[in-house]
A protein has these predicted regions:
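Structural motif
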Residues: 27, 53, 80, 154, ...
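Conserved anion-binding
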Residues: 3, 69-73, 78-157, 165, ...
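N-terminal glycine-rich anion-binding loop in soluble enzyme alpha/beta folds
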Residues: 1-24, 28, 104
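Glycine-rich phosphate-binding active-site loops on the catalytic face of alpha/beta enzymes
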Residues: 80-94, 186, 193-226
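Active-site beta-loop-alpha junctions enriched in small/polar residues
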Residues: 9-13, 35-39, 64-66, 90, ...
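Hydrophobic faces of well-ordered beta-strands that scaffold small-molecule active sites
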Residues: 4-10, 32-34, 57-61, 85-87, ...
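Short, acidic/polar
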Residues: 13-25, 68-76, 138-150, 195-202
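Active-site-adjacent beta->alpha loops and helix N-cap segments on the catalytic face
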Residues: 15-17, 38-53, 66-72, 89-116, ...
Length: 239
């Protein structure tokens, strides 16, 4: 039985590779993330394929531009039918408010459910040293909280952040704010290139709403068994 708190990242570049993953996981996974690599290579057929197979879609394109451009982009992605869409928090409150309004208006016109908009806080590839090297003045955790509060005030539904900041965001933004966490690594998996990581159970205990996991599942020798072990760990934490 799939647990919709688990989102599997389709970090591949072809439809064939995507279809292979979705087929291999079958009914064990109900939610997938389509990012830049796959969407830029194969376009909206990626989303349509997942929808046709009864899957939810997290479209992680990290929109970041002037408010009008982002608003038009969100309108297009709303028509496409994505369930979750990401917006860069560094674009500021005017941009985020424009995105929220565009999603609401487009969904109303089409008579469909509005996608949830998630603000990107600080990418999980950053550690303190690399963050400082690009001019980050606040500590990472403080910047994440600042952007999360700004996102909520601007009409965003939640954030994407490291699980290490999830507890602070949950306390700052309340029980209904979505917290989606990449950088999740079960005990049997390597950490790869992400610095701020956590296990599935610790992330959920600290307030994460949904977990994004890619390589520990998609590159596993037995992907469905990897999913089973992860869901088993997740279910030890009450929804």
């Amino acid at each position: 039985m799939a647990d919709d708190r688990l989102i599997v990242a389709l970090d591949v570049s072809t439809m064939d590779a995507m279809k292979s993953i979705v087929s291999s996981l079958g009914d064990s996974v109900s939610f997938y993330k389509v990012g830049m690599e796959l969407f830029y290579a194969e376009g909206d057929q990626t989303v349509r394929y997942l929808q046709e197979h009864g899957k939810h879609v997290f479209l992680d394109l990290k929109l970041h531009d002037i408010p009008n451009t982002v608003a038009h982009g969100v309108s297009s992605l709303t028509r496409l039918g994505a369930n979750l869409i990401t917006i860069h928090g560094q674009g500021g409150p005017i941009m985020m408010k424009a995105a929220a309004e565009a999603a609401r208006e487009s969904a109303e016109k089409l008579g469909i459910e509005r996608p949830k908009l998630l603000t990107i806080t600080v990418l999980t590839s950053f550690d303190d040293e690399s963050w400082t090297s690009i001019g980050g003045q606040l500590p990472i955790a403080d910047q994440v909280i600042r952007l999360a509060k700004l996102a909520k005030e601007s009409g965003m539904d939640g954030v994407v952040c490291s699980a290490l900041e999830a507890k602070m965001i949950r306390e700052a933004c309340g029980p209904d704010f979505l917290i989606v966490t990449p950088g999740i690594r079960p005990s049997f998996a390597a950490t790869n290139d992400q610095k701020r990581i956590a296990t599935p159970s610790s992330a959920l205990q600290d307030g994460a709403s949904r977990l994004v996991i890619g390589r520990p599942i998609t590159q596993a020798e037995h992907p469905q068994e990897a999913v089973r072990l992860i869901i088993e760990e997740m279910e030890s934490v009450s929804k």
